[in-house]
Amino acid sequence: MAPQGQEHYIPTALAVDSASMQTSADSIPVATTPEGGWGETWPAPVLAGCDEPLADEAPDLRGVWKVVDGPFVGHIERIEQAGRRVVITATGVIHDMVADGTLERGVNDVDPTGGAVSVAARFNDSRLDLFPNNMRRAVVTRFLDGDEMVWRYGPYRNRLRRLEVPTDGVHTELLNEADDV
C-alpha cells in the first residue's frame, strides 16, 4: 500500500548551495529497519527538514515510486536524498546509505526476509549503483529515464512511475492501476 500523507510525497526544498543550507545530511542519525520490519504504517521520512543540496553527480530520485512494468509490478518505494545520502524505504525495510563507495557508510541492515545485508553505494553516470559486499559490479541500479525511473535488481528490470500526493488522503488510482499495465 502507498504511504498516506503529503509528507511522504513532498521532499524538503534543498538549499541553493552548501553555504546556505540549514541542516546537513550527516547531522541526521542513520535509520535502520526496526526489529521485524516496519509493518503496515509507513515510517516518517528520515531526511525531513534536511536541505543539503544533492551531490553534483546524483540523479534526483526523490519521491514515492511504483513499479508499473517488470517482474515487481506493484512494488512501492519511497526515496529520500540529501547531499550524498539516500534512504530507500520499502517492503518493511529502511535502507539508509551514503553514496561514497564504502561499506562503512553504505547499507548495513536487513533485507525483507530478515537476512543481513552489507552494500556499498555510489553515484555513477547519473545512476545510483549498489554493490552488495562491495562487489566490483553493481548488482542494483536506479536511474531516471524521462519522467520514469528504471530499477535494475540483478537480472530483473523494472520501470517505475512517481506517485503524486493523494488529494483525498488515499491513493485510489492504485486500486485499478494494475489493469493499466
Labelled PLM ranges:
Residues 58, 80-83, 122-127, 143-148, ...:
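A short, structured loop/turn motif at beta-sheet edges
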Residues 64-66, 120, 159:
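Residues located in well-ordered beta-strands
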Residues 1-85, 165-181:
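Amphipathic/hydrophobic helical signal segments and adjacent flexible N-terminal regions
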Residues 87-89:
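Glycine- and aromatic-enriched membrane insertion/assembly motifs of diderm outer-membrane
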Residues 68-71, 91-145:
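Contiguous, well-ordered beta-strand patches that form the walls/edges
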Residues 158-164:
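Edge beta-strands of extracellular beta-sandwich domains
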Residues 148-155:
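Short, exposed beta-strand-loop hairpins at the edges of beta-sheets
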